[in-house]
Amino acid sequence: MLGGAVWFPYVLLGVGLFFTIYLKFPQIRYFKHACQVVSGKFDKKDTEGDTTHFQALATALSGTVGTGNIGGVALAISIGGPAALFWMWMTAFFGMTTKFVEVTLSHKYREKTEDGTMSGGPMYYMDKRLNMKWLAILFAVATVISSFGTGSLPQINNIAQGMEATFGFAPMATGAVLSILLALVILGGIKRIAAITSRVVPLMAAIYIIGALAVIFYNAENIGPSFSAVFMDAFSGSAAAGGFLGASFAYAFNRGVNRGLFSNEAGQGSAPIAHASAKADEPVSEGIVSILEPFIDTIIICTLTGLVILSSGVWNEKFQTHFERSAMSIIKGDYTEENQTQREDLYKYLNGQKSNIETFTGNIEVVNGEALSTGFTVLHSRSIAEDVRFGITEKHKYTGVVEVIDGMPTDDSISLVGKSLVHSAELTTKAFKRGYFGDSGQYIVSIGLLLFAFSTAIAWSYYGDRAMIYLLGHRSVMPYRVFYVAAFFWASFADTTLVWKLAAVAIVVMTLPNLIGIMLLRKEMKESVDDYWVKFKKDNEK
């Protein structure tokens, strides 16, 4: 998969590092000014645009603060260990500069549409400034695909599953209610979207932050060791701990950067579409506002999630769970965590290094869910699974022969359950139960997941309809919005795996052209920044 390619994180960080040095660390030098601009201190009357600086920031944040902040951080830590959090920070730090550049250029080349609203984004500077219409079309098509694959379908799918697991609500019922609410919001256009997100984003952030702090302070004695693990393992990889079998530097780096990108979308070119709607005479001023976005999304919210998971100790603890085929492998031989030689071999195997481990191929005799055969070990979520049982359903235990080829049962209807490490939102939920709120902490995750995911769907609908305007004109917007809502409802009870995989490729197809574009316009960007400060100082001397 392109998004998981070894070179992709290096390209992403490399561009951010280049602009950080080239523009002399704007994420540090302009941070205070960004807070002043977003507060409205320098606003002028009759400035062209659809939203205020704060509303544009809130809309962009509603697109970035999503399931990645809850499940994505947990997934990164479960795969890459504590070190993955460090590389998420690096992605955010350099991403603040990348975001500054892409937003400034997108705002600079925005256009007014037939209905009087603004439309901007990387496709406009690719077309109008670089004269690369084919690249602009490619970016816009990828944006439309991503609006479904990352912004809509997996969001409602996660919401529906979470509501069913926590409250017992039927997925279709959840989908129906939220689809109606989604339609009421997005059919009103950017002004209604901005009005809603500017209220929802602060509320959902406050709820989640309070819940996270309740866990972190409850486990205050583990805060120091958690930070120590993050920094000590950053350049060496995460050592084995508890049920966690360890992760190499490459795994920690790759997962941290990828999850960081998925969370704050720096370099992807999506958030600039929202910022292009802002009322601003100077594109650079809106670019400066966008510096706050990765900071809030990743440095604050993702860090809180990471500390909740690490300080509570659940990240390397085994729980009873259903095994996902994508995170499972059956290997030849009987392995235990107590055997140091076997642990070292498992570390190599799980990190793609040369090892003596072979995947299991053969038949496993099962009676009443329990395996009678020996000579194999089940791995799940980078841990040795314990108390493994085979079944057709949760209540129906399997009896018969399970055929396994290359480490995987050939019959998809046979499920495996047992004790292993867990990941994604399930891991975050376990962690939130280890605080002052006890088991009630799971409701904070469910409510957070609901608000985060729903707001992401709202923001991405706007990104998609601006891309449709560029591709097919204003008349395509309403059919797109109707189809977006219909697909949103369908995904509440359907399998969206294929769309998710397609979107993972689409994200890269968005990101690479955008990174190429901003690199080609680096000199123009520097000149724009210099001109902005000359004019700003002159205006404020009056």
Curated annotation (Swiss-Prot):
Q: Where in the cell is it found?
A: Cell membrane
The molecular function terms of the Gene Ontology recorded here are: amino acid:sodium symporter activity
Would I find Nucleotide-binding among this entry's keywords? no
Q: Which GO terms describe its cellular component?
A: plasma membrane
Keywords attached to this Swiss-Prot or TrEMBL record, sorted alphabetically, are:
Amino-acid transport, Cell membrane, Ion transport, Membrane, Sodium, Sodium transport, Symport, Transmembrane, Transmembrane helix, Transport
Chain ranges passing through the membrane:
1-21, 57-79, 83-105, 134-154, 167-187, 200-220, 227-247, 295-315, 444-464, 477-497, 498-518
Record-linked PANTHER family: AGSS FAMILY TRANSPORTER, SODIUM-ALANINE, TRANSCRIPTIONAL REGULATOR, LRP FAMILY
Query: What function does the entry list?
Result: Catalyzes the sodium-dependent uptake of extracellular D-alanine and glycine.
The Swiss-Prot or TrEMBL record describes its family as follows: Belongs to the alanine or glycine:cation symporter (AGCS) (TC 2.A.25) family.
Q: Quote the protein name from its UniProt record.
A: Na(+)-linked D-alanine glycine permease
Gene this protein is translated from: dagA
